[in-house]
């Protein structure tokens, strides 16, 4: 299994992601707000904000459900699997960067507790490797190995992913204790509605910026983009450019108000996040618990035997 390392150089990061997508057969790399964790990597030192929201939600505005499954407790220095699920209707198609329709991609970020990290290939059992498949997980940054990202990858194939994780050992890592820890997961399907610079993609609704009457609706490029000219009360002409993708729902001669939709909302995807907890279990506690249970069981057996012995003595005295 080959795991990527994050490059500080933006071009190097894009080449890395592009190479891995080609290996997966993802050839439709339009410069659109896909499920790109690299956008978060380039713009945010930490993908989880102080209010608990994962930054992917800044570009993927619709909320959709996600699922995260991990063991309730794990032992130190143990490989376990986290299963993430990004469900969606796989019959629907999204608007691509060129305005045409295509299948949805998915992406995810998994924020593990400090000390937890992606399991080395030589520690992953063969059965788990088969579940992981050809997915390549990479750390969010060189100093954040506990944060893993992947995507964009084909949603039809990877709406469910298995991540092999290595738990830390407090005996060798003094920054880790036997405690209960939170795990944060964010997953999205489909393209985003906003780019990191705040500009809109063609996968969102476009609204009027003024009050006025629509005087003209005309195409402005070969891809299918449309210009909507709005005449205001003071005689100004405001041109709203709609890229190929969203469908215009207004007509010439119609009066519109500020923030009134000029198009439908073509977005069929969305982002969701899930928080769970996992316990790093102390083996000595388990051993102590087993000894306690064994002691209780032994005491119960002795009580039963003592009771039977007492009953026999009573019966003998009565017969005498």
UniProtKB/Swiss-Prot annotation:
Gene Ontology annotations of biological process type: photosynthesis
Molecular functions (GO terms): electron transfer activity; heme binding; iron ion binding
Query: Which domain of life does this protein belong to?
Result: Eukaryota
Q: What does the record's cofactor remark say about binding?
A: Binds 1 heme group covalently.
* Spans traversing the lipid bilayer: 286-306
Cofactors that this protein relies on: heme
**Is-annotated flag, keyword Heme?**
yes
Q: Which positions are annotated as binding heme?
A: 36, 56, 59-60
Q: Which PROSITE patterns match?
A: CYTF
Q: Which UniProt keywords apply?
A: Chloroplast, Electron transport, Heme, Iron, Membrane, Metal-binding, Photosynthesis, Plastid, Signal, Thylakoid, Transmembrane, Transmembrane helix, Transport
Where does the UniProt annotation locate this protein?
Plastid, Chloroplast thylakoid membrane
How does it sit in the bilayer?
A: Single-pass membrane protein
Q: Which InterPro entries match?
A: Cyt-f_TM, Cyt_f, Cyt_f_lg_dom, Cyt_f_lg_dom_sf, Rudment_hybrid_motif
For whether the record's keyword set contains Signal, the answer is yes
Record-linked Pfam families: Apocytochr_F_C (PF01333), Apocytochr_F_N (PF16639)
UniProt main location, coarse: plastid
Give the record's family classification. Belongs to the cytochrome f family.
The entry's function note states: Component of the cytochrome b6-f complex, which mediates electron transfer between photosystem II (PSII) and photosystem I (PSI), cyclic electron flow around PSI, and state transitions.
Subunit comment for this entry? The 4 large subunits of the cytochrome b6-f complex are cytochrome b6, subunit IV (17 kDa polypeptide, petD), cytochrome f and the Rieske protein, while the 4 small subunits are PetG, PetL, PetM and PetN. The complex functions as a dimer.
Q: Which PANTHER family match?
A: CYTOCHROME F, PTHR33288
Question: What is the recorded name of this protein?
Answer: Cytochrome f
